[in-house]
Amino acid sequence: MIALEEKITTLPTLFVEKRDGRRVVFDVDKIDKALHKAADKVMDVTPLVEKRLNALTERIVTEIHSRFPQGVKIYEIQNIVEHELLEAKEYALAEEYI
């Protein structure tokens, strides 16, 4: 996980617009925790699964920063997470996440 955090922390600060209109600093840990929470419910989280989750988180964060450098709405983050899970054929994980 250290490599993931090091790579992600080099990205510029991004703000997230919440459903109630508040703007907060983007926190990659929230995505990571949500993916792990969903994974815990549908599979054994082995070191291999942990590696896949880290790779997914990295792809999700990269996509968010590339598409929304000026700020992102919370529903856009959710759409990207769902899309990346489906692209990775992580159907059970996607269903639990949704």
Regions found by a protein language model. Give the residues of each.
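Long, C-terminal-biased catalytic regions of enzyme "large/alpha" subunits
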Residues: M1-I98
